[in-house]
A protein has these predicted regions:
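Short hydrophobic/aromatic patches on beta-strands that form ligand-binding or substrate-lining surfaces
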Residues: 26-31, 45, 76, 91-103, ...
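Short surface loop/edge beta-strand patches of beta-sandwich-type extracellular domains
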Residues: 14-21, 73-94, 110-114, 119, ...
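Glycan-recognition/cleft segments
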Residues: 106-136
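Extracytoplasmic low-complexity segments
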Residues: 1-78, 124, 190-193, 206-218
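Extracellular glycan-interaction patches encoded by glycine-rich segments
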Residues: 167-192, 201
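Acidic glycine-/aspartate-rich tracts in secreted/extracellular proteins
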Residues: 30-40, 49-50, 99-104, 114-115, ...
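Short, aromatic/His-centered strand-loop micro-motif at the edge of beta-sheets
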Residues: 132-157
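Short, exposed beta-strand/loop patches in secreted or surface proteins that constitute
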Residues: 58-66, 117-124, 138-139, 167-168
Length: 218
């Protein structure tokens, strides 16, 4: 397993420190590259499962590329990334992210929708944050179940989004920074980490992932 310490693996398998969690099926840490990296257009999957993501149209500047605080910024114009070798949808997904660097800018942060099933993560101003396209699922913000906070309250905030959805149908593609049809719903997010599981995690497991992977929020 790439990028995950052996002691941490032991703790998870043994259940030490609380509810055990499965190994991630995809894991990105955007702080590991910069705009001069030879493979800057590839987000490496640190889980070892081959779900690298290819970045398209980035200018590789602080406003469209990697920036010094460890994030990758999508410019909301045409930047996006596509996850590779996806055979089914993730049932639990974590994003450490600033969802939009400008106010009143909607768009998709992540999309694995199959028709009106599974989920996409988007900012919709007058709807429950990140839940508009999460059919049959639940949404957590900073580890807490969200049923009241709406989209206009999440701009500019460094936060942890967690989606739990029981549908694992294979999507046509998995897109970061835009919608699955690449039809213009690009986001202006700053993405720090992304972690996905084929399992539905419990609230205790969600808390453990946040702690183990040192996901941060304001």
């Amino acid at each position: 397993m790439i990028g995950i310490g052996s002691s941490l693996l032991f703790d998870r398998r043994s259940g030490k420190g609380g509810s055990p969690i499965p190994q991630p099926d995809v894991y990105y840490d955007l702080s590991l590259k910069d705009n001069s990296s030879p493979t800057r257009n590839i987000i490496d999957d640190l889980s070892g499962n081959g779900h690298d993501a290819e970045i398209f149209n980035a200018a590789y500047t602080e406003s469209s590329g990697y920036r010094s605080d460890g994030a990758f910024v999508f410019d909301s114009i045409d930047d996006y990334a596509i996850m590779q070798n996806v055979t089914k949808g993730f049932k639990t997904l974590f994003m450490e992210v600033i969802p939009s660097l400008t106010t009143d800018k909607s768009g998709f942060l992540y999309d694995q929708r199959v028709g009106r099933t599974s989920f996409g993560i988007s900012i919709s101003l007058n709807h429950i944050a990140y839940n508009t396209y999460n059919w049959g699922g639940v949404t957590y913000i900073n580890g807490k179940l969200n049923t009241t906070m709406n989209g206009k309250e999440v701009y500019l905030k460094h936060q942890i989004i967690t989606i739990v959805n029981g549908t694992d149908l294979k999507p046509q593609k998995v897109v970061l920074g835009g919608d699955i049809g690449l039809s213009g719903y690009f986001s202006n997010m700053a993405l720090y980490k992304l972690i996905g599981f084929y399992d539905e995690l419990t609230p205790l497991q969600i808390e453990k992932v946040i702690n183990d992977y040192k996901l941060k929020y304001d």
